Amino acid sequence: LLVSTLDMTNEDFLSGNNDFNGNSPGQIVNKGDINATDGGYVVFIAARIENTGSITADRGGVLLGAGSRVVLDLGGPVKLKVEEAAIDALIEQGGAIRADGGLVYTSARAAGDLASTVINHTGITEARTLASGENGEIYLLGDMENDRIAVGGTLDASAPHGGDGGFIETSAAKVKITDDIHVTTRAEEGETGTWLIDPNDFTIAASGGDMTGAAVTTSLAGGNLVIDTDGADADNGDIFVNDSITWSANTLFLKAFR
């Protein structure tokens, strides 16, 4: 299933190039239940996307792209790429998305020089490892210059029925992790997976930071955590730990740009 509010040229359509572009203010809103066949994809492309319903695409993928130009290549290693930003680009994921044994890829870019929240995740996103061994991946991606993403709710790339845990990435210039976050890449029988947080700067603090020490502690109970700062533009790529963190299992890896 492919839904887009952006345009495609006749030449791209005839040649099979899924290159969508335009400045349409139209948005995609899903409040219902969408179920793809096993191995299928559900793709939404628009300047603004809101999901409060349910989307399922096991062994396939759910791809959400918000921008003014988005390129889709289901046969390539990068399935969806937001090439150009859109004014007021935003993806609101407050519903349920599941792609067990597959991919959930959410990417948005906002135009302008002011910081803007482009992804607000408050729902449940799952890409768990299947009993047959295929693991899942979850990506929440904003631009590394000005974009912000707010990450709450549940991100689940665990392996409850065997196999290794999956991979989760939350990446943007600014990444804010809310206190209600529940993230797991836990494997009951195999190797636990990893959650990567990739901002420009990152502060762990009891208040006023990007993530509390309590949220870090809780997240480490569900899997490995990597915080890797980029240091683009005016930001320095620093990591500040100003709150207590305790854990007895899994790995916390901090990699600062400077």
Language-model features: locations:
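Extracellular and secretory-pathway beta-repeat/beta-biased strand scaffolds
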Residues: 1-258
